[in-house]
C-alpha cells in the first residue's frame, strides 16, 4: 500500500495542534477555564490513566480562544483567606477573534484549498492570510507583553514557535494564560469564580483524589490525619448528613 505524503499534511496539522492542547497535571493541580461571557469552569486530569504519575488533560480543541489557568491545591492545608483582588489573570488584548481566525484558516480554509484542488494560487493566498493573521496577533501580544509577564526574550521564543509551527498559533491564548504564574490556589479561587454545579464538581474531584492519596500514605501519619480531617469539607451535603445521623 502506497501512502501519498500530501495526504499526511492534514493529520500532521491536527496532531501538532492537539499535542499543544495536551497538558499533564500533577495530582495537586487543576485548571480553571474562562469561557463564554466570563463564565469559569474547572477541570482535572484523568485519574485512571496517568503518564509518569501525571494526569492527562486535553483543552477543548474547538474553543482555542478560552484562557486556561493552571492552579495548585492542597486539601490538607488550612482554608485560605478570602482574596481581596480579582483572579490573577490579566485581560488578554482581545486575541480571541484572531486565534479563532487562525483555527478556521488551518482547519477549514487550508484543507478546502488544498484538497479541493483549487490550485497553487489559492493555497498560497490562504497561507498568506494565515501568516498575516498570526503576525497581527503577535503584534498585539508584543504591545501587551508586560501584562502577560513576557520578557523580550520570552516573546521572541513564543513568536518563533508560532511562526515556525502555525498549529501552535491556534493555541496562542492558552500559551499566554498558562505562562502566567497564579499565586491563588484552586480551593480559594473556586468558590469565588464558579457557580454551584461547577463548584460541586470541583469538590467531587478533590474528594476522589483525597481518597486516592489515603490509599498510599502511611496510616496514622500526620498527612493521613490531615487528609481525613479535610475530607468532610468536600463531601456532598447528603454524605455529611448521613455521617451526622450515624454518629448520633
Feature annotation, model-predicted:
Residues 1-34, 111-129:
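Long, highly hydrophobic alpha-helical transmembrane signal-anchor segments
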Residues 3, 9, 13, 105, ...:
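Weak global preference for isoleucine
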Residues 18-40, 134-155:
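Transmembrane-cytosolic junction motif
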Residues 21-71:
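Membrane-interface amphipathic/juxtamembrane segments adjacent to transmembrane helices
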Residues 37-48, 133, 140, 225, ...:
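Broad hydrophobic/π-residue packing in well-ordered secondary structure
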Residues 74-187:
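Transmembrane helical hairpin unit
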Residues 153-248:
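Charged, low-complexity cytosol-facing tails and large interhelical loops of integral membrane proteins
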Amino acid at each position: 500500500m502506497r501512502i501519498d505524503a500530501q495526504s499526511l499534511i492534514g493529520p500532521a496539522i491536527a496532531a501538532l495542534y492537539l499535542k499543544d492542547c495536551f497538558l499533564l497535571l500533577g495530582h495537586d493541580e487543576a485548571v480553571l477555564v474562562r469561557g463564554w461571557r466570563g463564565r469559569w469552569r474547572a477541570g482535572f486530569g484523568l485519574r485512571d490513566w496517568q503518564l509518569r504519575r501525571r494526569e492527562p488533560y486535553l483543552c477543548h480543541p474547538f474553543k482555542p480562544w478560552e484562557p486556561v489557568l493552571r492552579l495548585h491545591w492542597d486539601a490538607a492545608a488550612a482554608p485560605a483567606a478570602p482574596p481581596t483582588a480579582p483572579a490573577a489573570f490579566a485581560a488578554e488584548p482581545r486575541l480571541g477573534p484572531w486565534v479563532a481566525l487562525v483555527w478556521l484558516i488551518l482547519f477549514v480554509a487550508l484543507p478546502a484549498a488544498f484538497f479541493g484542488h483549487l490550485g497553487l494560487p489559492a493555497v498560497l493566498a490562504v497561507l498568506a492570510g494565515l501568516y498575516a493573521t498570526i503576525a497581527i496577533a503577535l503584534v498585539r501580544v508584543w504591545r501587551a507583553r508586560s501584562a502577560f509577564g513576557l520578557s523580550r526574550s520570552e516573546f521572541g521564543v513564543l513568536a518563533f514557535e508560532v511562526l515556525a509551527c502555525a498549529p501552535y498559533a491556534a493555541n496562542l491564548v492558552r500559551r499566554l494564560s498558562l505562562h502566567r504564574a497564579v499565586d491563588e490556589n484552586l480551593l480559594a479561587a473556586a468558590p469565588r469564580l464558579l457557580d454551584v454545579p461547577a463548584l460541586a464538581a470541583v469538590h467531587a474531584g478533590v474528594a476522589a483524589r483525597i481518597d486516592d492519596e489515603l490509599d498510599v500514605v502511611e496510616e496514622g501519619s500526620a498527612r493521613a490525619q490531615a487528609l481525613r480531617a479535610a475530607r468532610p469539607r468536600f463531601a456532598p451535603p447528603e454524605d455529611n448528613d448521613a455521617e451526622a445521623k450515624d454518629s448520633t
